[in-house]
């Protein structure tokens, strides 16, 4: 019985120990475990949200990059059109300037040609009068000479 009383004492001590652990030790341990489980669950949920946010950000970045490339392409096309337009305008302006310069040069050539013809006519008339004076061997007065030159110029 001695052994039974020892076993009974040990059983009572064990039951008291279990009750004490259940009452004072077990609740803080369970609270710590539950707190840790909650933190882990929150961390996993946060990681999942972060992954979704990252995927969304990458999709937005890809969309913005596509939009930027499209806008850049439009700007490049507009710049090329404007460049072509400026070149066409410059060519047209250069053509007009060339036409103007050619017309001015032609007018100057025509004026110079007329002046040279008039000068040549006067010289021919003077030479003709000089030749006629030598043939006649007499001097014609200045008024008559001028009259003859004018008539000769008009005939030429």
Curated annotation (Swiss-Prot):
Superkingdom of the organism of origin: Bacteria
Family: Belongs to the ATPase B chain family.
Transmembrane segment boundaries: 11-31
Role played: F(1)F(0) ATP synthase produces ATP from ADP in the presence of a proton or sodium gradient. F-type ATPases consist of two structural domains, F(1) containing the extramembraneous catalytic core and F(0) containing the membrane proton channel, linked together by a central stalk and a peripheral stalk. During catalysis, ATP synthesis in the catalytic domain of F(1) is coupled via a rotary mechanism of the central stalk subunits to proton translocation.
Membrane topology field: Single-pass membrane protein
GO cellular component: plasma membrane; proton-transporting ATP synthase complex
Subcellular location: Cell inner membrane
GO molecular function annotations of the record: proton-transporting ATP synthase activity, rotational mechanism; proton-transporting ATPase activity, rotational mechanism
Leader peptide range in chain numbering: none
Assembly notes: F-type ATPases have 2 components, F(1) - the catalytic core - and F(0) - the membrane proton channel. F(1) has five subunits: alpha(3), beta(3), gamma(1), delta(1), epsilon(1). F(0) has three main subunits: a(1), b(2) and c(10-14). The alpha and beta chains form an alternating ring which encloses part of the gamma chain. F(1) is attached to F(0) by a central stalk formed by the gamma and epsilon chains, while a peripheral stalk is formed by the delta and b chains.
Protein name as it appears in the record: ATP synthase subunit b
Keyword line: ATP synthesis, Cell inner membrane, Cell membrane, CF(0), Hydrogen ion transport, Ion transport, Membrane, Transmembrane, Transmembrane helix, Transport
């Amino acid at each position: 019985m001695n052994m039974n009383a020892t076993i009974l004492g040990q059983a009572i001590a064990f039951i008291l120990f279990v009750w004490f652990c259940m009452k004072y030790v077990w609740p803080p341990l369970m609270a710590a475990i539950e707190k840790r489980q909650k933190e882990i669950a929150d961390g996993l949920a946060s990681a999942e949200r972060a992954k979704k946010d990252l995927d969304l950000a990458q999709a937005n970045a890809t969309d913005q990059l596509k939009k930027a490339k499209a806008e850049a392409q439009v700007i490049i096309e507009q710049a090329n059109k404007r460049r072509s337009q400026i070149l066409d305008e410059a060519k047209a302006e250069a053509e007009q300037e060339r036409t103007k310069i050619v017309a001015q040069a032609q007018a100057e050539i025509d004026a110079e040609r007329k002046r040279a013809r008039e000068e040549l006519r006067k010289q021919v008339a003077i030479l003709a009068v000089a030749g006629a004076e030598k043939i006649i061997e007499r001097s014609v007065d200045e008024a008559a000479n001028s009259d003859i030159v004018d008539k000769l110029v008009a005939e030429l």
